[in-house]
């Protein structure tokens, strides 16, 4: 048990060191050698600091190749058989490329994948314009591990038609069941109307999917590639780009500085999906679920910046900020009204992160139950609340109530 825990923490340290080393190198985002330098730094850190360094050889190369292809197209929705044949020439060469900071393989996969995704985005709408005939029996292979890649673009389009038909059939069956239950309320829809609704739902979902994909930058794909390299050392070691490191810190500490709202993007609009209890927005009742943020300013005098065409992460960066500072949001309310809202940022705690205790009573005893949803710590300030100190407080609190015993529940997917 000690070795498992020790290995976990060493891996976590390596992950943070990789982030630190890379994030403290100064280079512009458009510098052509940036990615090569990242490969060089990551391989150096892993070789010198990892507790169990690996030999980067042909076996290592094969694993990186297989994992990367699986990571970018696990369901074989985009790449063609000819693409895989082209990529396979590098299957035994990735180790050499890592050692020489060469990224030819990544460049080839990235450019090819972008092209294939664009092709699918072009033809999926064409498929969904035509009603599906659910009276015609067809077969589709969903065993992705044993599924062959499409021979060509026409073959891929046929595969997509079957997959979309299956999705539409699933939606059709669900909607028809609801429809049949509403017969008494005279809300019955025809089968053709239900089929149209099913295709429309799929279209909306795919628009969101391709919108998200269009916002992915080269660095996002390169992070995937780097992580297929570092996870060969052990499953707990990972490369964190600066943006991912910020999210990691937020998740591991259970808090962040901002307005206290969760956002999502749909149809080029940034919408409030949740107001976080205890945050500035919640305390002053400033925003509601469904409100749309159209622009952001950092002062009352500043011209608001339109955010509809931004990546969601970039828009979020404009909205978040240090405790005590103000942000001015142009908001379209659910009722259609538009107004500018001033919000003073603060520290927002995610209550679902932290340890909590409760009492359970039966006829003879009172029991204490402590629930720890996840491990948490603030790496910037170890004096702040963390899982260990909070558990101690909860135990002492339960002891003061003279419970019969305490029991700690842990998430089953976390290592302890």
Stretch-by-stretch model annotation:
Residues 23-26, 31, 48-56, 213-218, ...:
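Cleft-lining beta-strand/loop regions that shape enzyme active-site pockets
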Residues 25-124:
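Charged, amphipathic alpha-helical regulatory modules used
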Residues 32-37, 54-59, 63, 103-107, ...:
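Soluble non-cytosolic domains of exported or imported proteins
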Residues 64, 225, 261, 281, ...:
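Terminal peptide-recognition signature
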Residues 130-252, 256:
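Extended, domain-scale alpha-helical bundle/helix-rich regions
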Residues 407-416:
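Single conserved hydrophobic/aromatic residue that forms the stacking wall/gate
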């Amino acid at each position: 048990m000690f070795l498992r825990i020790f290995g976990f923490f060493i891996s976590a340290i390596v992950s943070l060191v990789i982030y630190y080393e890379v994030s403290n190198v100064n280079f512009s985002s458009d510098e052509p050698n940036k990615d090569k330098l990242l490969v060089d730094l990551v391989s150096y850190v892993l070789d010198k600091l990892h507790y169990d360094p690996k030999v980067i050889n042909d076996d290592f190369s094969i694993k990186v190749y297989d994992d990367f292809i699986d990571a970018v197209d696990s369901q074989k929705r985009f790449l063609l058989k000819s693409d895989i044949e082209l990529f396979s020439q590098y299957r035994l060469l990735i180790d050499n490329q890592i050692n020489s900071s060469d990224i030819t393989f990544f460049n080839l996969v990235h450019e090819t994948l972008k092209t294939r995704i664009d092709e699918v985005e072009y033809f999926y709408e064409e498929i969904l314009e035509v009603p599906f005939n659910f009276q015609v029996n067809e077969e589709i292979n969903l065993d992705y591990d044993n599924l062959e890649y499409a021979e060509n673009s026409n073959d891929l389009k046929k595969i997509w038609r079957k997959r979309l038909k299956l999705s539409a059939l699933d939606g059709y069956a669900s909607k028809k069941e609801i429809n049949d239950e509403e017969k008494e309320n005279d809300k019955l829809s025809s089968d053709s109307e239900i089929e149209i609704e099913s295709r429309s739902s799929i279209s909306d979902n795919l628009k969101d999917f391709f919108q998200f994909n269009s916002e992915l930058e080269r660095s996002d794909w390169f992070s995937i590639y780097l992580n297929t390299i570092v996870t060969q050392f052990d499953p707990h070691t990972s490369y964190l780009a600066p943006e991912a490191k910020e999210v990691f810190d937020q998740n591991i500490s259970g808090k962040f500085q901002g307005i206290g709202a969760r956002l999502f993007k749909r149809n080029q609009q940034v919408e409030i999906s949740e107001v976080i209890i205890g945050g500035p927005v919640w305390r002053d009742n400033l925003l509601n679920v469904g409100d749309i943020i159209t622009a952001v300013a950092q002062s009352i005098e500043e011209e608001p910046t339109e955010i509809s065409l931004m990546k969601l992460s970039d828009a979020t960066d404009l909205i978040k900020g240090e405790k005590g500072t103000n942000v001015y949001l142009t908001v379209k309310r659910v009722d259609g009204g538009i107004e500018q809202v001033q919000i003073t940022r603060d520290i927002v705690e995610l209550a679902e992160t932290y340890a909590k205790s409760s009492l359970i009573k039966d006829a003879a005893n009172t029991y204490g139950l402590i629930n720890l949803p996840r491990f948490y710590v603030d790496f910037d300030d170890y004096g702040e609340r963390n899982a260990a100190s909070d558990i101690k407080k909860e135990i002492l609190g339960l002891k003061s109530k003279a419970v019969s015993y305490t029991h700690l529940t842990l998430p089953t997917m976390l290592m302890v």
